[in-house]
């Protein structure tokens, strides 16, 4: 009985014929290792226990953007006082009531402190009335007021209260304007919740003390220091820096762009003066606009950012078609 011939290369006859592509390698034989840098083709899975090689030194995902308003270095380029005025006016018109009401409330509080202090000082002082009659028989009187120790104490306490209220107002308005610069929603209450009030008070005392010392040196050094320290309170409110660091940061910021700082200061002064010329009622607009210019300048010169003004969207609907005559 005949049997079919065995084909060369059959597994039953390992010695016969050449092994084809579908044959199995002998035991202990492995495929040659891949050349350096060779990996599995895209889309395949790595065998268990195999890890991809680490990236070369210095390689990694790109860093994310820094938080708004918190730069790592100064980038004063790109500041324009015209842009500052335009941005500030746009933001004021979008938040007019929210900005005007706090300024009005602070003005009433300041007037109350000044009026109460003046009234108590006069009431606690000694007054002496002297009557005069001239040769024509016309009588007149003069009143001499002599301040007593009690009146002096009241005046001193009134100055302290006024100074604290001014710093509180400054910090509160800056807090609201900084939130506007960050694009956060603000309310009237935002301007009465100043951030970092303790740092602001100490920073304000430091500025007043150094300005007073500079004023003793022929006045001009005090004016110069007051100018270069104009952003110290903003740094304390916005970045929680210490009083000394706030003053140093303000000096560095102003020094990075003296021209822009001067133009911004003049723009703020103009806004307030125009408000005074309008029977002081215009200061309800001038003070918020000046504060917004101040915040814009501080952010731009210190390398921070502000949310740019948003243009109104076009009306919803299909554009009109061609009109037939």
UniProtKB/Swiss-Prot annotation:
Keywords assigned: Cell membrane, Membrane, Transmembrane, Transmembrane helix
Main location (coarse class): membrane
Keyword Membrane: yes
Organism name: Mycobacterium bovis (strain ATCC BAA-935 / AF2122/97)
Record carries keyword ATP-binding: no
Membrane-spanning intervals of the chain: 96-116, 153-173, 205-225, 273-293
Subcellular location: Cell membrane
Bias type Pro residues, positions: 24-70
Origin: domain of life: Bacteria
Membrane topology: Multi-pass membrane protein
Region of interest (Disordered), residue spans: 1-75
Family: To M.tuberculosis Rv2560.
Protein name: Uncharacterized protein Mb2590
One Gene Ontology cellular component: plasma membrane
